[in-house]
């Protein structure tokens, strides 16, 4: 699973996900992509589940890119712990995804196969997504 090799600080504030994504909202590497339609935290496990699905389809001559990276630590406290005594320890990592962000890209496969792969990968995500192609973006 994806996680940073080292970070400057062990714990982070939760933050908020206002507005739309201004970075990472265009197709850069492949011809087909999966785009987020709502903001959410996507865990490293969910990213990995989507990657496995797409990799299975792209294996036959295709290439895929993961455009998000889980760099935010989420802390949790042990079960049945009283309030107070500081913040919990980091348990897992998430990627902060805003509306419009590209999650995955794929190239080297037919549009039909790419759409099938992205549809299954979309079911692994906790948000609504849409399948987009490079031609859709350039034509309008």
Curated annotation (Swiss-Prot):
Annotated GO MF terms: rRNA binding; structural constituent of ribosome
Pfam families the record matches: Ribosomal_L16
Location in or out of the cell: Plastid, Chloroplast
Keywords noted in UniProt: Chloroplast, Plastid, Ribonucleoprotein, Ribosomal protein
Protein name as it appears in the record: Large ribosomal subunit protein uL16c
PANTHER family from the UniProt entry: 50S/60S RIBOSOMAL PROTEIN L16, LARGE RIBOSOMAL SUBUNIT PROTEIN UL16M
Organism: Psilotum nudum (Whisk fern)
Assembly notes: Part of the 50S ribosomal subunit.
GO BP annotation list: mitochondrial translation
InterPro entries documented for this protein: Ribosomal_uL16, Ribosomal_uL16_bact-type, Ribosomal_uL16_CS, Ribosomal_uL16_dom, Ribosomal_uL16_sf
SUPFAM superfamilies in the cross-refs: Ribosomal protein L16p/L10e (SSF54686)
UniProt keyword Plastid, yes or no: yes
Similarity comment: family membership: Belongs to the universal ribosomal protein uL16 family.
GO cellular component, one term: chloroplast
Membrane listed as a keyword: no
């Amino acid at each position: 699973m994806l996680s940073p090799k080292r970070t400057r600080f062990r714990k982070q504030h939760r933050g908020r996900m206002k507005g739309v994504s201004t970075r990472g909202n265009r197709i850069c590497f492949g011809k087909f992509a999966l785009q987020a339609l709502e903001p959410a935290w996507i865990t490293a496990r969910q990213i990995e589940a989507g990657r496995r699905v797409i990799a299975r389809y792209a294996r036959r001559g295709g290439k895929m890119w993961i455009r998000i990276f889980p760099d935010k630590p989420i802390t949790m406290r042990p079960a049945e712990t009283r309030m107070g005594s500081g913040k919990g320890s980091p348990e897992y990592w998430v990627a902060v995804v805003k509306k419009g962000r590209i999650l995955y890209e794929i190239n080297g496969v037919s549009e039909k196969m790419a759409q099938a792969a992205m549809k299954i990968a979309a079911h692994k995500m906790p948000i609504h997504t849409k399948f987009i192609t490079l031609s859709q973006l350039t034509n309008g």
